[in-house]
Amino acid sequence: MAHQPPNRPPLIGDPSGPAPPYPFRMSGLVISGFGRGSKELGIPTANLPVDDAQTPWISSIPSGVYFGWASLNLPASHPDSLTSSAAAAAAAAAAAAAPGEDGGGAGEQRQRGGNGFAVYPMVMSIGYNPFYKNTVRSAEVHVLHRFGADFYGVEMRLLIAGFIREEKDYSGLEALIADIEFDCEVAKRSLAREGWAPSGVDVEVDVPGEGVKVLRGSLECGWLIRPDELGEGGK
């Protein structure tokens, strides 16, 4: 597990779920970013365009690190697509190996998404990233899943459930990476609670100190897998 920095709580929010004004919604096609997430940080990001017209709330929220859920409509040719043969085989093996966290028995089929969308935990930065001296506000999403290939141009939807911390500058790259790694752990712990996990779909979260859990909670996240809603970015 990542080292816990001073004055950093391990969890965000009440166990019952996100509090107003959350959750926020954001969607778009994944675009190329600054190219440093994987190369310098070892933390790949999937960027979305920042559009004040589509997401009017984004200009008024603090710059910083947020967390929540991401859904991706990956093409069948992508190794992580819900319809790819590799993903289907992996899902079948996982379902046969152990019971689901929602009480399902061994061998029960898990519903990872719908309408081609799969749902994953995520942590994201909205802001200017002072360490890199950005002059344009960006939305950089780190989906908490190890993907077998890139997915530029794919539709991604975000349900932003809460705020972790404000952005800040760092004296060096190691300090930045340490904070990001702890952000990821905070997101995983927070999202693994019943009030924060999606209802209607099963999601996998690699909870620090506990391992991978398959969860189904009570948070309404139907928008993440609803068809034909690209461009919706409101509350």
Curated annotation (Swiss-Prot):
Positions bound to Mg(2+): T45, N47
SMART domains: Flavokinase (SM00904)
Cofactor binding note of this UniProt entry: Zinc or magnesium.
Cross-referenced InterPro entries: Riboflavin_kinase (IPR023468), Riboflavin_kinase_bac/euk (IPR015865), Riboflavin_kinase_dom_sf (IPR023465)
Active-site residues annotated for this sequence: E140
Reactions it catalyzes: riboflavin + ATP = FMN + ADP + H(+)
GO terms for biological process, alphabetical: FMN biosynthetic process; riboflavin biosynthetic process
Entry keyword Mitochondrion: no
Cellular component GO terms, alphabetical: mitochondrion
UniProt GO MF annotations: ATP binding; metal ion binding; riboflavin kinase activity
Cofactor(s) named in the record: Zn(2+); Mg(2+)
Pathway given in the UniProt record: Cofactor biosynthesis; FMN biosynthesis; FMN from riboflavin (ATP route): step 1/1
Organism domain of life: Eukaryota
Coiled coil: none
Enzyme Commission designation: 2.7.1.26
Family designation: Belongs to the flavokinase family.
Protein function: Catalyzes the phosphorylation of riboflavin (vitamin B2) to form flavin mononucleotide (FMN) coenzyme.
Protein's recorded name: Riboflavin kinase
Originating organism: Chaetomium globosum (strain ATCC 6205 / CBS 148.51 / DSM 1962 / NBRC 6347 / NRRL 1970)
